[in-house]
């Protein structure tokens, strides 16, 4: 009985996902790209301008010169 319930719930989720994504196929790539860009942290290379250590790829910022340095 448990196996049948799991199969039924899985089938319901698959059909719901299929019907909700109809007509939106061309936008799926855009959503994926937006999600990836939000997850990607951009950092400043050594020698670039910085205001705090977390903006540098090396996590080291010389606050006197306001440039990222190698750590």
Curated annotation (Swiss-Prot):
Expressed by the venom duct. Disulfide bonds join 43-57, 50-61, 56-68. GO terms for cellular component: extracellular region. Transmembrane segments: none annotated. Residues 18-40 form a propeptide. The presence of a 'disulfide through disulfide knot' structurally defines this protein as a knottin. The cysteine framework is VI/VII (C-C-CC-C-C). This is Conotoxin AbVIG. The lineage of its organism: Eukaryota, Metazoa, Spiralia, Lophotrochozoa, Mollusca.
